[in-house]
A protein has these predicted regions:
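Residues on the lipid-exposed face of transmembrane beta-strands in outer-membrane beta-barrel proteins
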Residues: 46-52, 97-101, 155-159, 199-203, ...
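Outer-membrane beta-barrel "beta-signal"
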Residues: 329-344
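Transmembrane beta-barrel strands of outer-membrane/channel proteins
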Residues: 24-32, 62-66, 108-114, 168-172, ...
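Outer membrane beta-barrel
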Residues: 51-173, 284-288, 294
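Residues that define the transmembrane beta-barrel architecture of outer-membrane proteins
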Residues: 34, 40-46, 90-95, 149-153, ...
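Loop-centered beta-sheet repeat module
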Residues: 158, 164-222
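Detector for outer-membrane/organellar transmembrane beta-barrel domains
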Residues: 169, 203-294
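Repeated loop/turn-to-beta-strand initiation elements of outer-membrane beta-barrel proteins
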Residues: 22-24, 56-60, 105-108, 163-168, ...
């Protein structure tokens, strides 16, 4: 894996300096976590994005991620995962690898992709560090779909107008990160892995954003209740969601989220969240709380965060999380630093 990354970096850097219609972007995010008792964790994410023009309307896209942490388990035994970058150590995994074709107002991508590239990426939602603001738990909890840090073979279509946009995707029902072996990221096997299809209709006007979506998924539920992740059961489920980012005043937005899952008795059945974000000079703060109903429990998760830009290409983001479950609660603080290396 390390040799592959070095070769990829070398090729991309050379392309950036000598090729036309090519671009490399390197971003690094690191995060210090503490439970204010005895526990600490250091989480890291390295991402490389590479694009190469294959023609007037055709582009080759590739992105890799590498994750590392110093602690083998999370500081909190939470259902929603308070940090949206924390994962097990993965030296190298694909986020995207494929070709995108532009057709007027439309675009079509075919290849390896994870759904975090396209969905739940609007500005207000993206401020928060809770994983549920990156993808609603009704869609992701306990199902190994093409969700960070894994990806799968898929098609992604977009239709863009000034205010309206439509997104539609079809993925292999299970995501992977390995490059070889039976369970590799290039695998497409709907018979055993199932299929995940997603559609989202989006509208924006005067600084406000509105989204409504629907997903169909047939796949395998990871049965952790018996302590044996290998034991799975095939299920079909339907998920609907919607969220609004309403501009209340210049630099002030309200956030409202909701989602419901049917067709299965497992995972997250319903989810609702609300929040407020504000700008203070060049900095941005936010307050968010959500409720997720799992089978057979529930979880409240609240977050206070403040994003402080620096040096034009980076930011520092201190955040405080409070998590409440039946019979347990957690207080977690984190300090996130992120920087995008300027390209030449």
């Amino acid at each position: 894996m390390t040799r592959f990354m070095k070769l990829f970096l070398s090729f991309a850097v050379v392309s950036c300096h000598y090729g036309e219609g090519q671009e490399l972007q390197v971003s690094y995010t690191t995060e210090l976590q503490s439970d204010f008792k005895q526990g600490n964790n250091w989480v890291n994410l390295l991402r490389l994005d590479f694009t190469h023009s294959l023609g007037k309307h055709t582009t080759l896209q590739a992105a890799t991620i590498s994750t590392a942490r110093t602690r083998p388990e999370s500081l909190a035994d939470d259902f929603q995962t308070f940090s949206n970058i924390e994962e097990e150590n993965h030296p190298l995994a694909l986020a995207t690898l494929g070709v995108q074709q532009q057709f007027g107002h439309s675009s079509l991508f075919f290849g390896i992709r994870n759904l975090n590239e396209d969905y739940f990426t609007s500005p207000v939602t993206s401020l928060f560090t809770n994983s549920s603001c990156g993808i609603f738990p009704t869609l992701s909890a306990d199902y190994q779909i093409a969700n960070y840090p894994v990806a799968s073979v898929g098609l992604h279509y977009e239709l863009q107008f000034t205010r309206w946009s439509l997104q539609a995707s079809v993925y292999n029902g299970k995501g992977y990160y390995r490059f070889s072996g039976k369970e590799n990221v290039f695998r497409f096997c709907p018979q055993s892995d199932g299929i995940l299809s997603i559609t989202s209709l989006n509208y924006q006007q005067h600084g406000s954003n509105y989204h409504v979506g629907f997903a169909l998924h047939s796949g395998m539920y990871m049965d952790y209740e018996e302590g044996t992740p290998e034991k799975t059961k095939k299920e079909r489920r339907k998920i609907i969601w919607g969220y609004a980012e309403q501009r209340l005043a210049p630099g002030l937005h309200a956030l409202l989220q909701g989602s419901f899952q049917s067709g299965t008795s497992r995972g997250c059945k319903s989810y609702a969240g609300t929040g407020l974000t504000w700008q203070c000079g060049k900095t941005e703060g936010g307050l968010f709380t959500d409720y997720a109903r799992f089978s057979p429990s529930y979880e409240w998760a609240s977050e206070f965060t403040w994003k402080i830009p620096f040096s034009g290409n980076g930011f520092i983001q201190p955040t405080l999380h409070f998590i409440q479950q039946a019979g347990a609660h957690y207080l977690i603080g984190l300090l996130r630093f992120s920087y995008v290396l300027p390209t030449t």
